[in-house]
Amino acid sequence: MKDDNRSGGSARGRNRLVLRTPASWWGNAWREALPSGNGIVGAAVYGAVSSETVLINHGELWYGGKPGELPDVSHTLPEVRRMMDQGQYREASAHLAETLGRLGYESVRETPLPLADLNIRRPVDSGFRRYRRTLDMESGEVSVRWEEGSDAYERALFVSRKDDVIVCELRGSRKGSVAAELELKPHQKGEAASPGIPKCVEESAAVSTAVLAADGYIRYAAKNDDGLDFGAVLRVIPQGGTMTAGRDKIAVSGADSALLLIKVFVKGERERDWLRLERELAAIGQAYAELMQRHAAVHGPLFRSAAIRLQDESEADRSNEEWLLEAYEGELPPGLAETMWAYGRYLFISGTREDGLPIPLYGLWCGDYKAVWSHLMANENVQMMYWHTDVGGLSALALPMFRYYEERMEQFRDNARKLFGCRGIFIPAGTTPGNATPFQVVPVILNWTGAAGWLARHFYDYYLFTGDESFLRERALPFMREAALFYEDFFVVAGDGKLLSYPSVSPENTPGNFMPENHTFGGVGHPMPSAINATLDFAIAKELLTQLIEGSRIAGVYAGEIGRWEEMLARIPEYQINEDGAVKEWMHPDFQDRYRHRHISHIYPVFPAHEITREKDAALFVAFAEAVRRRLVIGIGDQTAWSFAHLANIYARMEEGELALECLSLLARSCLLNNFYTVHNDWRQMGISLNYRRAPVQMDANLGWVSAVQEMLLYVSPGTVKLLPSLPQAWNAGEARGLRLCTGSIAFAWNRDQGRLVAELKAERKTELVLRLPAWAGEWTWEAAGEAEAQAAGPHRAVIRMAPGSRLTIAAGSA
């Protein structure tokens, strides 16, 4: 069988994952499958030779949830505050949650529901040789190849972003060598310890088959717990050979190849949707290459919109297994750092689309029933999954996240009113597509009020990077105003004229003086999280109010409210420093810092915000750096994949390239599966992260990695751009293109050993900024195309002014 590169992507080398083994996680092989997706439909290929499984999912298929009817318990807020004023912190922390419990409030979260498995069984006459499974990220094609005797075989699959169909082709090198038995059925779980097929699915699943002329069809459907059907139709198109239909299977034998086309439906009625999908499948072309070309024309430009090169060409053909073995030696290979950056972008592009839902923590490839931590969690995780989008040129794919929260605003207003008696919105940290009421009825979640404000920065960043004033006026500012209204009612003015925030939670942490000895707490993960004046609360509020004032003036709205917001800003207390020289996590004397924790949200003013930099406030910057250092040194065994990714982003922002790289290295050694999915924690008792046997897949770290690499190479704020601010020694040479500035784009290449750096800036809107070059770069010159100029502003600094449509090239060293 010749390699005709029908994928339309990269034939070999960069932007490919290569594995020498099939998915092998016992009972949960989906965890190591290779993913393909079109933003709403996902397919995960296990890679078995004899009995292949392809897990099929749809982003809108969730089950098991039930929104609660929230009672009005706003009277508890003054009660909680009285308790806290009297030092009864434990009682105060639990009061809201206990009150809801006494009133019988219950809200149940949904989880993703796997749609179906495609099983492909084939006879094996001799043992396999030269096995490979690959993912071409440029095209989204997953392929499995092997040899048996003198024959070679391949299965190739992608999910079309153009035609909304799963396309799979079975190939053999010898005419008539393709034989397979095909079946659609409920997703199978092999691990008895985890939940199996839901009763509603098991009792309602139905399969029918038919061979009509040269085509075969398999129809599959089952019922969700809401009584609505979901399912799929498979069309089988063999080239040559024979095709027969059994009760629930279709068999192909003696074929040269076989094309499989699958369309899925959710929230429907099986008979009607089967007929509709059969008509759609009958109208689709029958050539794999043609369908791939149509899909690649949409997927490819998204994936190739940005590129980073850190590795030599000689490294590009390594397998995932080889990359991981090298990472275990302790040094993160530049090629693995690059590949993980590309893979995170691939997962994001494949896991969401503009008219869909935000990407969830499992992407579109969850194979668990009742999956752990599968909801959208906005006390860091959702935000981490979108940190990369603007600089990475994928701002348009943040729109589903904005729409998701906007569509639930009335429930968020109800939450704020009934829980706290406040105007504006209260967004629970955890939500699902069908449930925006609080379903984590515990103090650490209920008493945290920062989700709306933290999410608001993403709305404003979208405006900053697109210049879309309609979005600013009609969507960003109204959302931000609702978040600010909540703070207006929730914050209290203390006797010294400063604001108080209480109860106040620093996400998922408990002050050190409220922790049991030895940090063990009888299974209660958060013994006393509710404090006064969490630093994060005021960091979020300060950024929100600053941007709301700025944006309102730009858009010419809310003029009568700006004075109020300015007064609130003036009343926000200053950040405080503890006896260790670290920024305090709680700005109140009754609450001591606790460094042994995975969350590090109080570093928000440094990252993701731009409030504190070394240039603006060197002393405070050092105090933030000390708080970060103590987290990593003291609490390495308390970290997770996403916390290592968060730390990498923070160290990159602090221009500590070696430490940022070490965080990525720790992540790779502890929380990376062989298909490069990130999991929450290590499962092998290796001492680097938390220990949790199930180690759930959590793709926040995959996407946090993308942001960290970008931050290491490029710092972007509205008025400042820093080239290579956090470049580790291992990345001595490389290039980047397609990364975004607030008003345009930038491409650059460097070789530190030679002191060379070349950067080209393109302005799409009026651009005025300070550009900082790395200290190792030599003397620089500039050349403009169009109305643009660069003026020296101190060592390694230039003031850049560019008109729309102009280009400016900066060259340093002997470039």
What annotation goes with each model-predicted range?
Residues 172, 761-765:
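Asparagine-centered strand-capping/turn motif at beta-strand->loop junctions
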Residues 355-364, 472-474, 492-502, 557-564, ...:
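Short, glycine/acidic-rich hinge or "gate" loops at secondary-structure transitions
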Residues 33-56, 60, 99, 112-114, ...:
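C-terminal capping/lid segments that line or modulate ligand- or cofactor-binding pockets
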Residues 448-462, 475-489, 643, 660, ...:
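Extended, hydrophobic alpha-helical segments in both membrane/secreted and soluble proteins
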Residues 418-420, 448-461, 497-505:
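Core alpha/beta catalytic barrel or barrel-like domain that forms the active/cofactor pocket
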Residues 468-469:
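Short loop-to-helix capping motifs
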Residues 334-338, 473-478, 642-645:
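Alpha-helical scaffolds flanking conserved acidic
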Residues 2-443, 450, 461-463, 481-484, ...:
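Aromatic-residue-lined binding/catalytic grooves and analogous aromatic/hydrophobic interfacial grooves
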